[in-house]
Structure formats: structure tokens, C-alpha cells
């Protein structure tokens, strides 16, 4: 029986792509690079901000880029429209909390920015635990971040469900031995997600209520 539902953050619960795009292009401009399209930047997120910088400026300039990106991104997240909850998310979180499920977040974002987002959107109180790559033994797609959350909350793998929007999330859950629901609201396409054969697939977060509410979790 599922007792804990762990969520990825970006593309799963929130849309912060506008803020990410602004900060990436600001950083690129400061370093003399041409701006990149919103679509290209969106496709490149998921591995954490250092990997994002490496992707656009290379390993040699990554640390310099981070020193520019992070202060700008902290401000960009606070701007109107910089980050928002994806459709249906708030209702699903409140529904699950009301049903007695423990909720957690596993994100490759740094803890600082994750907490900025959750506080701004007034949903931090809904989560029993938030664990990010900078505080985990290894980032996704390595399984340690999911194991650490389950262990901290005294639960077994079979009592955990993970929800994410990227192929990296599917692979992370598979390595962890944890059931996974892929949702096509983020960076990976519907085909990319389905090709990896996650335990379940949904096209919008509100559909998660049916999976959990109908007790399909314990029946599968």
C-alpha cells in the first residue's frame, strides 16, 4: 500500500521555465554567447543548474557562469510570471494530503531555489520532506535521492510512488525499485516517456487523483 508520494519539481509541479530562460540568456549574454530559444532551454533542464551551464557554455566556463546565473535566477523567480503551479497541482496536493499520504519532493535543483519556489507559491507546508541534489548523496537519475527520502520517513520502497516529467525521472525510479507515474507536462515528450514504459502515464496532474483515489496503486 502506498503511503508516500514523491514528486519531482520543475515540469511536474511547477512551471519555472520563464525564469530559467531569462537567467540562462542573461548569463550567456554576460559571457558573450548568443541567446538560446525557450524551447532549447526547456529541453536542457533537469540535471541541475551546473549541468545546465555546462550544456550551454562548456565545462571550462561553468563555474563562472553559475556565479552569474544563480543571483539572477533568485531574482527572476520572484518576478510576476517567473514561476507558477502547473494546472491541477494544488488540488491534487491538497487531495492527497487530505487522504493521509505523506508528500515529498526530490529535485535536482539546489535547495535554495527549491525552497524559494515552494515558499513563493505557498505550498511548502504540504510536504513532509524536501530533498535536493546538493543535499543528496547523488543526483537523479541515481536512485539514492529517492531511497534517502523513503528511509528518512521510515518507509519501504513498495510503499512509495514517484511522479516526474522527464526520462531522467523514469530511470531514477526504475533504478530505485520504486513505482513511477510519468506526467507529460514538462521537458520530455509523451513518446519519450512512454517508450521507457513507466509504471503509469498521465498527461495532466489532475489524473493522478484517479490513480490514487481508485486505489489502483495497491491493486497493480
PLM feature spans:
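Substrate-recognition element of Asp-dependent hydrolases with the DxDx(T/V) motif
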Residues: 89-118
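Conserved Lys-Pro-Asp/Glu-containing loop-to-beta segment of HAD-superfamily phosphomonoesterases
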Residues: 4, 139-170
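Intrinsic, low-complexity polybasic segments
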Residues: 214-215
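A short, structured active-site edge motif that brings together acidic residues
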Residues: 40, 123-138
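Acidic, Mg2+-coordinating phosphoryl-transfer loop and its flanking beta/alpha structural elements
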Residues: 161-201
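Conserved H-loop
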Residues: 34, 123-128, 156, 199-202
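N-terminal helical cap/lid subdomain that shapes the substrate entry/recognition surface
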Residues: 2-91, 95, 110
Amino acid at each position: 500500500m502506498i503511503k508516500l508520494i514523491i514528486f519531482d519539481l520543475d515540469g511536474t509541479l511547477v512551471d519555472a521555465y520563464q525564469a530559467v530562460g531569462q537567467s540562462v540568456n542573461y548569463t550567456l549574454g554576460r559571457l558573450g554567447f548568443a541567446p538560446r530559444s525557450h524551447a532549447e532551454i526547456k529541453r536542457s533542464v533537469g540535471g541541475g543548474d551546473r549541468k545546465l551551464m555546462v550544456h550551454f557554455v562548456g565545462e571550462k566556463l561553468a563555474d563562472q557562469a553559475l556565479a552569474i546565473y544563480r543571483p539572477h535566477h533568485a531574482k527572476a523567480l520572484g518576478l510576476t510570471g517567473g514561476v507558477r503551479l502547473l494546472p491541477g497541482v494544488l488540488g491534487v496536493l491538497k487531495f492527497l494530503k487530505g487522504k493521509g499520504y505523506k508528500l515529498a519532493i526530490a529535485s535536482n535543483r539546489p535547495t535554495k531555489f527549491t525552497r524559494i519556489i515552494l515558499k513563493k507559491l505557498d505550498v511548502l507546508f504540504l510536504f513532509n520532506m524536501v530533498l535536493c541534489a546538493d543535499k543528496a548523496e547523488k543526483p537523479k537519475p541515481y536512485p539514492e535521492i529517492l531511497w534517502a527520502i523513503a528511509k528518512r520517513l521510515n518507509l519501504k520502497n513498495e510503499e512509495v510512488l514517484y511522479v516526474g516529467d522527464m526520462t531522467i525521472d523514469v530511470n531514477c525510479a526504475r533504478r530505485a525499485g520504486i513505482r513511477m507515474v510519468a506526467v507529460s507536462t514538462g521537458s520530455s515528450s509523451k513518446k519519450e516517456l512512454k517508450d521507457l514504459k513507466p509504471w503509469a502515464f498521465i498527461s495532466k496532474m489532475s489524473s493522478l487523483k484517479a490513480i490514487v483515489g481508485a486505489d489502483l496503486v495497491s491493486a497493480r
